[in-house]
Amino acid sequence: MARQTPIERYRNIGISAHIDAGKTTTTERILYYTGVNHKIGEVHDGAATMDWMEQEQERGITITSAATTCFWKGMDRSLPEHRFNIIDTPGHVDFTIEVERSMRVLDGACMVYCAVGGVQPQSETVWRQANKYKVPRLAFVNKMDRTGANFFKVVDQMKTRLRANPVPVVVPIGAEDSFTGVVDLLKMKAIIWDEASQGMKFSYEDIPAGLEGVAQEWREKMVEAAAEASEELMNKYLETGDLTEDEIKLALRTRTIACEIQPMLCGTAFKNKGVQRMLDAVIDYLPSPVDIPPVTGTDDDDQPISRRADDKEKFSALAFKLMTDPFVGQLTFVRVYSGVLQSGSSVYNPIRGKKERIGRILQMHANQREEIKEILAGDIAACVGLKEVTTGETLCDIDSPITLVKMIFPEPVISQAVEPKTKADQEKMGIALGRLAAEDPSFRVRTDEESGQTIISGMGELHLEIIVDRMKREFGVEANVGKPQVAYRETIRDLVKDVEGKFVRQSGGKGQYGHVVLTVEPQEPGAGFQFVDAIKGGVVPREFIPAVEKGLIDTLPNGVLAGFPVVDVKVTLTFGSYHEVDSNENAFKMAASMGFKDGMRKAKPVILEPMMAVEVETPEDYAGTVMGDLSSRRGMVQGMDDMVGGGKVIKAEVPLSEMFGYSTSLRSATQGRATYTMEFKHYSEAPKNVADAIITARGK
């Protein structure tokens, strides 16, 4: 089957924003203008097409990033048809994993900001993720019709909070109730959208009186930013004082793709203004798969190789999301980087060393689907029939393997015990949790060996709440959940030398003998565990060294204070002895474990607790109450900023253990007028009284 859209006209983009910036509404409008939706879905009434899980429609927030394909010929329908693959990403901080996954497979992103709220904490997280994957992006300032809307304030916030380099290519005509359209700074014309056609039609008009000065000032800034793309353009700009529309577009495109600038637009998705111009900007400034560097990976010998975005190259793709679909079973969303894949053919998974057959290939549109015969370089689609692929793994041609860079996922910070309401559901719950864990790498399931309880762990209270909710809705398993438990860690503060571990058993016949001498010392936070073999002269034979390391690693999950996992410790094997007959791997494993535990006890062990970055937005009247409450939760208030339109933003670092049920108490303290966001920051040593309480509670 021939390619219907040349790859140069593909745009794989994400739409990303803080909660309530109007991202789902923006996506809905895109689907409407590109002709996919004939009735606009509103988030307010729970009918938005992209939010297709029941919980999302109830909560009015987007949880899973649905992938949608649509087509655009430009606002005035004068361009050749471009194909947009849009990934809708969640804005809630408990779902940053979804954002991270989608960033990995996007070529460009559109950041949506609220004209009133501006750049919020979650926006900063998303921005950092986009920087990490070097994703070119545009900014769209939404909700220009709201009271307190201020486009230029958001421009400033992008510079100060995100250290971004925004370049407005439009400026608003009016704001709040009087927002009527935008001035296109390239054409120096006003764009006014026709309300009767829900913004499908528009007209170019003269710039309203009184706006020419502002438009001229921002046009000069835009042309200057374009001129910096090359020496040649800069010279022309210095000589003539201007550049042509095509020169500006091309120069801004070059600099956007290089992540040097971010073109900026504005509008109100809800009132059908501005999204159309943003779609044109996606074509003008964001890259196609061939505009970005070839994807890199490693071959079977761990040598670096790359693949160009070309149908003639060997097939390579990344599985970036798994979903369980009630009708077809497991869907594996893939981004194809090179080559072509037909339904019914086989692919190779180099990470598992396994070959798998693709059953069907589905082109997704939110929650509707269309079966297609093949996918080509640059495509994003869902495959049915893959049994053993998990998120972040590569699929490639059997004859020329490539392993694309694996994604790194954060460790969960909160755990809860969960049990089915009826014993009969035990097995069903196991299957349900297994499926949900396969879909979401930031969610873990394990069985507590001592209590036999099933423990689920995730990125926050809302994350686990939604998992339990999905278990009930999708798998029919009702569960009771225990009190949330914090993921504490243990580490040490002192260096201890010459710690001995000796395991000797003599019970007639062959005995056991292992003897090690260790140095145990703390490492930098986040450095993890390190083992160093410093044995000289074979006092511990070579073949037993791996057993020593294994003994140490097996001891890490259970610390000496309260049985929490041990982190950031370095252990050096310095000396030891062995017995010709009685020494074996098991004896050295036991000796290493005993020595390590003894070393931990002597090296000033401490408990570490997860600290959260908390931001509370509150009316000024309650600022004192909120700060007092955060301090009473052992929080360190780090600053307070003014919010536009009144109110304060309070930033603090608070232990996670003190934040349970915070949303309820914040609501009652501020009569429901304050909101907060929270995300994991780092681990920090728990004060002695807190550590003692944790140890006592664990000992019961």
From Swiss-Prot:
- Cite a GO CC annotation: cytoplasm
Entry's CDD domains?
EF-G (cd01886), EFG_III (cd16262), EFG_mtEFG1_IV (cd01434), EFG_mtEFG_C (cd03713), EFG_mtEFG_II (cd04088)
What subcellular locations does the record give? Cytoplasm
Q: Which residues cross the membrane?
A: none
Its GO biological process annotations read: ribosome disassembly
Q: Where does GTP bind?
A: 17-24, 88-92, 142-145
Q: What does this protein do?
A: Catalyzes the GTP-dependent ribosomal translocation step during translation elongation. During this step, the ribosome changes from the pre-translocational (PRE) to the post-translocational (POST) state as the newly formed A-site-bound peptidyl-tRNA and P-site-bound deacylated tRNA move to the P and E sites, respectively. Catalyzes the coordinated movement of the two tRNA molecules, the mRNA and conformational changes in the ribosome.
Query: Which NCBIfam families does the protein's record reference?
Result: EF-G (TIGR00484), PRK12740.1-5 (NF009381), small_GTP (TIGR00231)
Query: What is this protein called in UniProt?
Result: Elongation factor G
Give the originating organism. Leptothrix cholodnii (strain ATCC 51168 / LMG 8142 / SP-6)
Task: Provide the organism lineage as a comma list.
Answer: Bacteria, Pseudomonadati, Pseudomonadota, Betaproteobacteria, Burkholderiales
